[in-house]
Amino acid sequence: MSRKRYIVSFLITTGATCGLYAQQQTVVDNRGKAVSVMIPTASETMAGYVDVDYLDDKFYNSSIQTGFGNTPSTNATEPENSMEIIDRKMRNLSEMMTMTCNEEVKKYIDRYTKAGRQSTCYLLGRARYYNPIFEEALRFYGLPLELKYLPVIESGLNPNATSRVGAAGLWQFMATTGKQYDLQIDSYIDERRDPEKSSYAAARMLSDLYKQFGDWTLALAAYNCGPGRVNSAITKAGGGADFWAVYQHLPKETRGYVPAFIAANYVMNYYADYNITPLSTGLPNRCDTVIVEKDVTLAKVANVLGMNVDDLKTLNPQYRQGLIKAFATNGVAKLRLPSEMIEKYKKYKEQIYQNETTNEEPNMTIAATHISQKGILY
């Protein structure tokens, strides 16, 4: 988004040479297996770049189980990866967006697949949950589905990611921009963190930017630094058909933004070439949405359904105080639940709405627990 400068996880701006701060996580999954893994967190690596606060560590750093039941290899495999071969594969990724490989893009591919490969494993796992949400919004506006990888570089696929300048959510909306695109932000709800609503808002904004610039690389640059700066870069360049034509006149962080996006598209599709496999994140395989008819706390819902309240908050990060105000939201209030909980919710709906509290401990956990200490990933 515009008006913010930061990096997420393993992304380093072009020219940065310092290591990424990370947490060494001792992860305990639901089977009781403990393994130490390095999970990068955003850190200040250059003057002007600020970190992102990852607040849902439970899910972001949860299980080390891969989709195949094995811990992924930590050794990068070197496939046949000349720029010509990568460029040929990249051109097969999209019919609507032009993506090519050059030295800048290759730098980010290397970072995703080498120093940042553990982060890539987690991002692949989280993408299985979030991509269907993104794709639905992108299809609604007739946009390239490849844009679903934009939150990879915006937020590390973390709806609770918050930049120091106040950008929030998967798509990193500033409050003013979020309200411009009809996202409700108040003391009870922040729809910038709502995966579904923020995705529709982001798709609408990207559609507007593409209509303005007529090129997806320029639209992406404008999403990062704002249309004004892109127009200024075009003027300084004496006109420009795409991002690469105005590259030298863009802000430093934006020069790395589009190459990082292109690299993310490539790696998220060809990760197997680098011996990278998705990690299970503890997020449910499928979710559905129910309408909330009365004010209710997430703690009450979790207690009646036998869920862990932190799991429920992770699926519904937009509710700032853990309280759903049924008639205080735009449209109707919604609650996202694992699909297997929908019928149970309907069955016990009246009990959920009863004005009573309980101290009973929830008895189901869908994510692992962890302990951590600071470490460094190079």
Task: Label the model's feature ranges.
Residues 165-187, 199-201, 206, 230:
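Substrate-binding/active-site groove segments that recognize
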Residues 6, 19-141:
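An acidic, Gly/Ser/Thr/Pro-rich helix-cap/linker signature
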Residues 113-124, 134-136, 140, 159-167, ...:
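Second-shell loop/turn segments in exported
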Residues 279-306, 360-378:
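Primarily a LysM-type cell-wall glycan-binding module
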Residues 9-17:
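Bacterial N-terminal signal peptides
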Residues 250, 315-352, 374:
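Extracellular LysM carbohydrate-binding repeats and other cell-envelope/extracellular binding modules
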Residues 156-164, 180, 209-212, 227-240, ...:
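Secretory-pathway/luminal and periplasmic proteins that interact with or process carbohydrate-rich
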